């Protein structure tokens, strides 16, 4: 089976590439060149028939991913499907099913069947439930069985923590971190490695993993098991050593035509973000970078969507290609629908703010909004806003008597004042 990367290397412009080119207003040659060399990916499993393809990477708009899924404390698949509907409403490009309890295949199959967004999973989360074995009883190649099952079901990309091999694990042990390993998948694999005194199975059998990805054109999202879970741990030896391992794994995937993106931090002081984006691009030869936040402070509990949006905007402006949303419930509980909405909007704002910095053409919508404000065209403002529904609701909660202003400024509306005076009219504030 050929992947999007293989087709690009042969100069074949697939229907998925055509859709992305139209969405991004990019040329055929630009896309072919950058998909062929790995700087742009189009996650598109051959079995995901409902997919509306999107590209991630160089020269493209920053994409947003929404996480959802059940846990052993909250098993309500109907609510998770409502989160999917909400993600679709906001035109989210990627959805990850992070369910880590029970038999998850039915929900995942439904997700692939109904979702136009690309679907991602973390197969190691599903290992215990799928295999019906406790962690210590799972064999190295058992993990690949889970990967195969997910790939066959139509998942477009998978987080695989192949970089935390014995070398990276050794450096982690010497790192004296405050928060150790905060990646769920990474912590599970590390525990398995320690209990079995064995190499990371995804690293040991990486070629077998690539064969699965090739068969279904699954994009590898190389997970950062050693991402910093606190600003204290950011940019340390453990994080960077794993990134080096991921760069080597990226090249091996590219050599056979498997698409790759790299996952990144995490928690990180705002002054370290740009350098980390540049380092990933340098080490991984331009492979798309998919970051969680980064959260720029550790004390924003209840408001981590704000901390994540601040870091995400800086990351996107500095080269990050996809942002994983962060909700107000981060670090506290499974998010509800309102948390998901707040996280989506905050992250879309961050992604767009970054795009204005790196893709000047993306300012056009902002200019239209500014024009609508100058013209005091409320309906146009609501239409252009990222969350126009909330904007309209807030406006109507204290609707002004004179629609040439809002309830904040009333007759002292600066826009209305300037519109009148520049037309040669007198201004009356009485």
From Swiss-Prot:
A single GO BP: thiamine diphosphate biosynthetic process
InterPro entries: ThiC, ThiC/Bza_core_dom, ThiC/BzaA/B
Gene3D superfamilies, per database record: 6.10.250.620, Radical SAM ThiC family, central domain
Biological pathway: Cofactor biosynthesis; thiamine diphosphate biosynthesis
Residues given in the record as substrate binding sites: 67, 96, 125, 161, 183-185, 224-227, 263, 290
Coiled-coil regions listed: none
Top-level taxon in the UniProt lineage: Bacteria
Keyword Heme included in the entry's annotation: no
GO cellular component terms given for this protein: cytosol
Oligomer status and interactors: Homodimer.
PANTHER family, per the entry: PHOSPHOMETHYLPYRIMIDINE SYNTHASE, CHLOROPLASTIC, THIAMINE BIOSYNTHESIS PROTEIN THIC
Protein name, UniProt field: Phosphomethylpyrimidine synthase
Native source organism of the sequence: Campylobacter jejuni (strain RM1221)
Lineage: Bacteria, Pseudomonadati, Campylobacterota, Epsilonproteobacteria, Campylobacterales
């Amino acid at each position: 089976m050929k992947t999007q990367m293989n087709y690009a290397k042969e100069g074949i412009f697939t229907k998925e590439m055509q859709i992305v080119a139209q969405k991004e207003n990019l040329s055929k040659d630009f896309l072919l060149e950058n998909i062929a060399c790995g700087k742009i990916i189009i996650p598109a499993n051959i079995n995901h028939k409902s997919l509306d393809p999107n590209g991630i990477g160089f020269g493209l708009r920053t994409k947003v991913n929404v996480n959802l899924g059940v846990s052993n404390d909250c098993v309500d698949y109907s609510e998770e499907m409502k989160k999917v509907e909400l993600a679709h409403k906001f035109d989210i490009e990627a959805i990850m099913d992070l369910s880590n309890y029970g038999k998850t295949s039915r929900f995942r199959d439904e997700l692939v069947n109904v979702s136009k967004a690309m679907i991602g999973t973390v197969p190691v989360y599903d290992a215990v439930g799928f295999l019906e074995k406790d962690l210590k009883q799972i064999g190295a190649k058992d993990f690949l069985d889970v990967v195969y099952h997910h790939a066959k079901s139509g998942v477009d990309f998978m987080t695989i923590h192949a970089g935390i091999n014995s070398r990276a694990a050794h450096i982690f042990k010497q790192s004296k971190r405050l928060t150790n390993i905060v990646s769920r998948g990474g912590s599970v694999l590390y525990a398995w490695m320690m209990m079995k005194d064995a190499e990371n199975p995804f690293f040991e059998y990486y070629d077998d993993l690539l064969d699965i990805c090739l068969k279904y054109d699954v994009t590898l999202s190389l997970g950062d098991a050693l991402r910093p879970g606190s600003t204290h741990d950011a940019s340390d030896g453990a994080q960077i050593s794993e990134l080096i391992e991921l760069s080597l794994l990226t090249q091996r995937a590219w050599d056979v035509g498997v698409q790759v993106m790299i996952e990144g931090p995490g928690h990180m002081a705002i002054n370290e973000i740009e350098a980390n984006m540049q380092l990933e691009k340098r080490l991984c030869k331009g492979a798309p970078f998919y970051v969680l936040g980064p959260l720029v402070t550790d004390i924003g509990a209840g408001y981590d969507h704000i901390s994540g949006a601040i870091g995400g905007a800086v990351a996107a402006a500095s080269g990050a290609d996809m942002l994983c949303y962060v909700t107000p419930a981060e670090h506290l509980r499974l998010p509800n629908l309102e948390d998901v909405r707040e996280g989506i909007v905050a992250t879309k704002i961050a992604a767009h703010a970054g795009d204005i910095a790196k893709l000047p053409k993306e300012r056009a919508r902002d200019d239209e909004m500014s024009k609508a404000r100058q013209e005091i065209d409320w309906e146009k403002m609501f239409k252009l806003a990222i969350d126009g529904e909330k904007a309209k609701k807030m406006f109507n909660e204290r609707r002004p008597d004179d629609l040439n202003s809002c309830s904040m400024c009333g007759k002292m509306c600066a826009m209305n004042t300037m519109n009148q005076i520049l037309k040669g009219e007198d201004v009356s504030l009485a």
